[in-house]
Amino acid sequence: PVAVKNSSRQGMEGTEASRVKENISNEQFDIVYSSPLSRCRKLAAFCGFHEPILDDRLKELNFGEWEMKKWDDLTDPRLELWYKDWIHLPAGGGESYENQCRRVAQFLDDLRHSGHTDACIFTHRGVIACAMVYAGICPIEESFSIEVDYGSKNVLEF
């Protein structure tokens, strides 16, 4: 499968989205998936995939009460505990990274058994990190130490 990370920082005509479109323009996919979140759906459409299969398992980590807040603005006492154990503890009462990786692994298991061999996936950094763990590229503890650029194309083979 090909996991394509999205960013809407510069809009769809910006360099990141255009780079993704260019990077996959010569690829042939037998199936296309997207996170249902709008920035991934918009990027998929910009790249010519107007009806990707939307799958909730491709969503970014659920940060619970911390969702859409700046880190500097958080005063939640759980934040310090989460920093110390971000793999196992739920972020803001939402989801733990370990649970996110489980749902991504379930998606990838289903994809591997689907018969599709060339998939394009429009998703988020955390999902890509979980996919790297699944593919054996790195242990879960190191999954965010590998650089994944905004707008990059990431190819994973299983």
Place the predicted regions along the sequence by residue.
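Generic structural signal for well-ordered alpha-helical scaffold segments
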Residues: 18-22, 101, 105-113
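Short beta-strand scaffold positions
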Residues: 34-35, 102, 122-123
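Active-site-proximal alpha-helix that buttresses catalytic centers in soluble enzyme cores
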Residues: 1-50
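Active-site-adjacent alpha-helix immediately C-terminal to a catalytic or transition-state-stabilizing loop
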Residues: 41, 106-158
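Catalytic metal-binding/acid-base residues of hydrolase active sites
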Residues: 38, 58, 126
